[in-house]
């Protein structure tokens, strides 16, 4: 595997996916401090929004400390070389949110759908291209679709105007061979000028290995987060990815030492709990469950007395996907009733 001289764009997730473990309560000062550190370290693209994207502030997903406008308005003017991106999920974010992001100076918009629902992205992708934004299609929970199925979905996004398409391992479920099969097929099917990206999670400790496998397959954009701050066991840890790429001769443009300092000095101190592979986040990866379900399942555990792991396994069995957060509590109630019924039978 010789990737010497290969150039990739490292895309930071700390200030968007990292909002999940922060319960979307990151302060403006924290946001600005980390963004400036990433910018100074040479990170070229930084995502800033609610964890569930533009318009994510809601009862279903959680209310943030500040609005998307406030976060973006605070960060964008401070950037010296980095561009800022925003995530948008059709059905949560609207075309008005997209226009607002453009007006504030957002460079890249990533339109995200479930890996079988690319058709709902047409309006937003088409508008983003009309606004001359760097326009990315983002296929989530990619392990739930076959390589052939993902090819069809990626080509739809490309036809709407996406100049880059992401294969997204939202559950941290995929192994390197899964990544190669999917990204290899999609890379072959897309136009040569359409970029390919990969977004990984570290629930099975595969974040780095999967990202390198993606680069092997022609991916030129790779997502990562400082100190791994993200949903579940976190995203691919940025400082480790940059170091591995440096060892392999893959060019990121990110300073190996400065990015470590961002993680240690700025990100780790604001963590509400350690981002690590505990039994619940491991279960996310093993059972193929959407990463941001983790804290919802932990809350349901406290409320109904059903272990989060048991809830997550059941969610995986049911094939629940992002957007069905309201079903987590329903699942916990069902499991609690089943436990109570079983206990009564044993007692009898």
UniProtKB/Swiss-Prot annotation:
From the UniProt record, list the reaction(s) this protein catalyses. (S)-4-hydroxy-2-oxopentanoate = acetaldehyde + pyruvate
Q: Which residues take part in binding Mn(2+)?
A: 17, 199, 201
Q: Keywords assigned by UniProt?
A: Aromatic hydrocarbons catabolism, Lyase, Manganese, Metal-binding
The signal peptide here is none
Please name the Pfam families in this protein's record: DmpG_comm (PF07836), HMGL-like (PF00682)
An example Gene Ontology molecular-function term: manganese ion binding
Site positions (Transition state stabilizer): 16
GO process terms (BP): catabolic process; L-leucine biosynthetic process
Which protein is depicted? 4-hydroxy-2-oxovalerate aldolase 1
């Amino acid at each position: 595997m010789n990737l010497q001289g290969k150039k990739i764009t490292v895309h930071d997730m700390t200030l968007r996916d990292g909002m999940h473990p922060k319960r979307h309560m990151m302060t403006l000062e924290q946001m600005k401090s980390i963004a400036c550190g990433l910018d100074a370290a040479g990170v070229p693209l930084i995502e800033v929004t609610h964890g569930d994207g533009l318009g994510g502030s809601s009862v279903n997903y959680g209310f943030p400390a500040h609005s998307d406008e406030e976060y973006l308005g605070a960060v964008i003017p401070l950037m010296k070389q980095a561009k800022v991106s925003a995530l948008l999920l059709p059905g949560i974010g609207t075309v008005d949110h997209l226009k607002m992001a453009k007006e504030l100076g957002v460079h890249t918009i990533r339109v995200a759908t479930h890996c079988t629902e690319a058709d709902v992205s047409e309006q937003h992708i088409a508008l983003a291209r009309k606004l001359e934004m760097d326009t990315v299609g983002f296929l989530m929970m990619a392990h739930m679709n076959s390589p052939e199925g993902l090819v069809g979905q990626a080509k739809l996004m490309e036809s709407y105007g996406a100049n880059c398409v992401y294969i997204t391992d939202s559950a941290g479920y995929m192994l390197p061979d899964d990544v190669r099969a999917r990204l290899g097929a999609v890379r072959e099917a897309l136009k040569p000028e359409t970029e390919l990206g990969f977004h990984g999670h570290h629930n099975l400790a595969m974040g780095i290995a999967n990202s390198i496998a993606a680069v092997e397959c022609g991916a030129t954009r790779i997502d990562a987060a400082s100190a791994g701050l993200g949903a579940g066991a976190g995203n691919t840890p940025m400082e480790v990815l940059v170091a591995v790429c440096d060892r392999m001769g893959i060019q990121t443009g990110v300073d190996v030492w400065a990015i470590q300092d961002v993680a240690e000095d700025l990100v780790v101190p604001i963590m509400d709990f350690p981002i690590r592979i505990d039994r619940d986040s491991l279960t996310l990866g093993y059972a193929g469950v959407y990463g941001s379900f983790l804290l919802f399942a932990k809350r349901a555990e406290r409320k109904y007395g059903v272990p989060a792991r048991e809830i997550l396994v059941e969610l995986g069995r049911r094939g629940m996907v992002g957007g069905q957060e309201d079903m987590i509590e329903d699942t916990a109630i069902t499991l609690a009733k089943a436990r109570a019924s079983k206990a009564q039978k044993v007692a009898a």
